[in-house]
A protein has these predicted regions:
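Extreme N-terminal tail/first-helix region
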Residues: 1-20
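Charged, gly/pro-rich active-site loop segments
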Residues: 2-3, 79-159
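Short N-terminal helix-initiation segments at or just after the protein's N-terminus
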Residues: 14-18, 36-52, 83-95
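Short, intrinsically disordered, mixed-charge
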Residues: 19, 59, 67-72, 123-127
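Short beta-strand segments
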Residues: 21-58, 74
């Protein structure tokens, strides 16, 4: 990380960034080409291990890529506004916080593990619990888990 003074290492601050964000961009490698998709997500962060969950249709381009190469790169960011630089364009900046890292997308197969992952995702997205997921709905839904092998967090906070 070039701007090491912006690094965030405190687990509670990392959780706060993740809690504020609702969309994650997942980058895939489609043969030699990048392919990036925005998705809603949920997460667990325990003992310095960050695990991300998202869902997808069972078939489609994302799933085809994952079968060939499950390596992904995830970015999560929160935008906090433009820092006005006056008349000097090079003095402008942006207030933000972000978490990003590399991992492998694993497709969950059992309905119970899908339900557990969807509970995490739905609680993150809505703040609510107690959702019902029918077996027929789950059969048409791919649920993916990405344990980040390494990740970084940084922020440029408003003063």
């Amino acid at each position: 990380m070039r701007r090491s003074e912006r690094a965030v290492t405190d687990p509670q601050m990392i959780r706060e960034i993740l809690d504020r964000a609702k969309v994650m961009h997942v980058g895939f490698v489609d043969q030699a080409d990048p392919y990036v998709v925005p998705v809603n997500f949920g997460y667990t962060y325990e003992d310095d291990v960050l695990t991300l969950y998202f869902n997808s249709a069972v078939t489609g381009h994302k799933m085809d890529i994952i079968k060939e190469n499950p390596t992904v790169f995830c970015t999560i960011s929160v935008q906090d506004g433009l820092k006005d630089g006056g008349d000097n364009a090079c003095s402008f900046s942006y207030y933000y916080a972000s978490v990003m890292g590399k991992g492998r997308a694993l497709r969950l197969t059992g309905n119970e593990e899908k339900r557990a992952a969807l509970d995490i995702l739905m609680k993150h997205q809505t703040g609510r619990e107690g959702f019902v997921y029918g077996d027929s709905s789950l059969s048409r839904l791919a649920v993916l888990k990405v344990k980040l092998e390494n990740f970084t967090a940084k922020m440029n906070p408003k003063a």
